[in-house]
Curated annotation (Swiss-Prot):
Catalytic reaction equation(s): L-glutamyl-tRNA(Gln) + L-glutamine + ATP + H2O = L-glutaminyl-tRNA(Gln) + L-glutamate + ADP + phosphate + H(+)
HAMAP family reported for this sequence: GatC
GO biological process, one term: mitochondrial translation
Protein name according to UniProt: Glutamyl-tRNA(Gln) amidotransferase subunit C, mitochondrial
GO cellular component: glutamyl-tRNA(Gln) amidotransferase complex; mitochondrion
Enzyme category, top tier: ligase
Organism: Drosophila pseudoobscura pseudoobscura (Fruit fly)
UniProt keyword annotation of ATP-binding present: yes
Family: Belongs to the GatC family.
Length: 148
């Protein structure tokens, strides 16, 4: 109950605050953008496994779960390089790095007023779907291959 009240209190304060006049202050940033201006060489720690061996049973499982054919050598090479890259990322030291919710979490973002422009168009929206059930969209199951 306290959480709901505090959320409502914050919403009232945020609604009174004029965010439209607040602009993003990029002077606090080291650069004008988070993207480096010049290429940065990233050195990953060397791992012992240069090539990961994947057995046929695991490949069949991955094909069934992801609905991607891994028949060609190029697909297996891409899978292998992705696993190697994930292994390198797993060994990066992030001990003193604070997690971010967003890149601009210390900046005020502009909010717009919530205005209903169109409403009660449920029937028109449901006409766009191939299959509906009781005012819901029905999507195909993800674990069954589609007919080609």
């Amino acid at each position: 109950m306290l959480r709901v009240l505090s959320r409502r209190f914050y919403c009232k304060i945020a609604a009174k605050t004029n965010f439209k006049t607040a602009k993003l202050d990029f002077k606090e940033l080291r650069y004008a953008t988070k993207v480096p201006q010049t290429p940065v060489d990233t050195v990953f720690p060397e791992t012992n496994a240069n090539r990961v061996e994947i057995d046929a049973k695991t490949i069949q499982l991955l094909e069934r779960l992801s609905l991607v054919n891994l028949d060609s050598e190029q697909a297996l090479a891409t899978l292998n390089s992705s696993i190697q890259f994930a292994d390198k990322i797993a060994h990066i030291n992030t001990e003193n790095v604070r997690p971010l919710y967003t890149v601009l979490e210390n900046q005020q973002l502009q909010l717009r007023n919530d205005e209903v422009k169109e409403g009660d168009c449920r029937v028109e929206l449901l006409r766009n779907a191939k299959v509906t059930d009781e005012d819901y969209y029905v999507s195909p199951p993800g674990n069954i291959p589609l007919e080609q």
